Structures are given as structure tokens and as C-alpha cells.
Amino acid sequence: MIYAGVTADNQGAFALAYGMSGGLHYDLFTPDKFKDALDKVEAMEGRCVIEMPEDGFIETPEKVNPAVFARMYCRGRGMPFMFVKPGSVRRAYNIKDGQTMAEECRLRFPEIELRGLPDQQEETAKAVLLAKYAKRYL
């Protein structure tokens, strides 16, 4: 199982993506649910990957830095964890300017259903692509 956290609109909303029992299951969470999500990942002996800005800080309304929290949480429990710089997923999948993550996700992984509003679909698609990308390294 891989947990992929993706910031949305710099407000610290997270799209989670994790592979379970041969499929990929994903959902949308906000920082108040972040610890619960990591507990779930730990319980399933999972791995964690987060895309974050160059400066290493994500601003959230709750004054929580989920990226730093995740790093401390994962290291403290010995869970495999990695950061990915913004843009890495687009480069890894060769996604052109003007093309959305949702379009790429539908092309590469048609079995995954993207639900919600277009913005939510885009964030979820990014989390799915990030999780698949991280599988190579985690």
C-alpha cells in the first residue's frame, strides 16, 4: 500500500491514494484527518510519499504542517517515506502543458474511476499518479 499526499490550493487539503488487494483505493482528506490516515497506512504496513514545495513548508489553516508531521510520524515508526518535488510527476509521465493529470490518469489507468468535481478529480488523479510513481522507489 502506498499513501500519496498532494497539497490542494496550498491550503493543505490532501488527496490520498493507496494500493490495496491488487487495486487502487483513494479518497480525499483534510489535515484534521491526516493523523487518522497515517494510522491507517501504518496499520496496513504501508509506505508514504508526499509532494511538497521547494521550501519544505505547506501552509494550512489549522496551523499544522502536514509534511513535517508526516516525516516525523513515519520516521518515528520506521515507515518507508519519501518527498517528491513539485513537477516530478508531470516529468515522470511526460505530461505536456495544457494536458491535465486526470486525462493522463484515465489514459494510463482506465480501471480507476475519478469522482467529484473537476478540481477534486485532478487532485485525486495526481495522487494516483504519484502513488504509482513512488512504487518504483519505495
Set out the residue ranges of the language-model regions:
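Phosphate- and other anionic-substrate recognition elements at nucleic-acid/protein interfaces
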Residues: 1-138
